[in-house]
C-alpha cells in the first residue's frame, strides 16, 4: 500500500475541488495512483468534482521585494476578494516576491519549480489551494537587476510599482512610484508609447474630428492635437506631478538632478475577464440536471 501524503491529497483537491476526506479515500483506494484517484472521484461525485483550476482568478495581490541590487514585483491571483486578504496567501506572495528577486527565475514555470519551505513553490501553492479551497495562481512577475537605485510602492495589495532611478534620495524614488500608482502612465516618455495605442487614439480622434464638419486641413490639425495631448497624458515624464501641480515629473526630476530609467506597474486582475454569475441560468441548469437523474 502506497503512503498517502498531505501534498498528494492537496494536489488531488486542487485538480478536482473535492472534499479533503474524499480525496484521501480516493487516493487510498487507488493505492496512490493520482490519475486513478481522480477518475474515482469523477465517478463518485460527478459534477461536484469540478476542477478548481478551471475557475477564473481575477482577484489577488501584488507583492514586492528589494534586496541588494535586485527588486521584484509579482502578481498572484485568487478567485475572491476575501481570500486576497488571507494571511497564508499574503505570506506566500511575499516569499514568492523574494524568490524572484534573489533567484532570478526565467519565467513562471521556473519560479514554480524553485525550492520553498522544504518543498517547491508549486507544491506550497497546491497545498494552499487545498487549505483555502480556491484556485490560486502566480500570474506574472518582473525583476530589475541594477547598480542604480530601486524604489517600490504598494497601494494596499492591489497596485504595485517598481522604479529604477538615479541621482535622487530615497524619498524622490518613493514619490515617483506613488505617482505612477495614482496616474498609471503606460510609458516613460511619449516616444515609448506603444504604436498600437497611438493608432487607436488617432482613430478615435479622427472619428470625433470628422463629425465637426470642418475643412480637412483643420481636421488634420485637430487629430494631431488630440494625439499629442494623449501622449503627454500617458507618458510619465510629461505627467503633472501629483504632489505638485506646478511641475511635471520631468521638471521635478531635473530639479533634483535625478532621472528615471524604467518602471513597472501591476494592477491586480488587469486584462482578466472576471466571470459574472448568472443566477437564473445557474438555477435552470440545476433543474435540467435534476430531470436527467
From Swiss-Prot:
Lineage per the UniProt record: Bacteria, Pseudomonadati, Pseudomonadota, Betaproteobacteria, Burkholderiales
Q: What NCBIfam families does UniProt report for this protein, alphabetically?
A: tsf
Job description of the protein: Associates with the EF-Tu.GDP complex and induces the exchange of GDP to GTP. It remains bound to the aminoacyl-tRNA.EF-Tu.GTP complex up to the GTP hydrolysis stage on the ribosome.
Top-level division of the source organism's lineage:
Bacteria
What are the record keywords, sorted? Answer: Cytoplasm, Elongation factor, Protein biosynthesis
The terms describing its cellular component in GO are: cytoplasm
Q: Which residues cross the membrane?
A: none
Q: Indicate whether Cytoplasm appears among the record's keywords.
A: yes
UniProt-listed PANTHER family: ELONGATION FACTOR TS, ELONGATION FACTOR TS, MITOCHONDRIAL
InterPro entries per UniProt:
EF-Ts_dimer_sf, Transl_elong_EFTs/EF1B, Transl_elong_EFTs/EF1B_dimer, Transl_elong_Ts_CS, UBA-like_sf
Q: Belongs to which family? A: Belongs to the EF-Ts family.
Q: Report which gene this protein is encoded by.
A: tsf
Q: What is this protein called?
A: Elongation factor Ts
Q: Where is this region: Involved in Mg(2+) ion dislocation from EF-Tu?
A: 80-83
- Gene Ontology terms for molecular function: translation elongation factor activity
**Where does this polypeptide localize?**
Cytoplasm
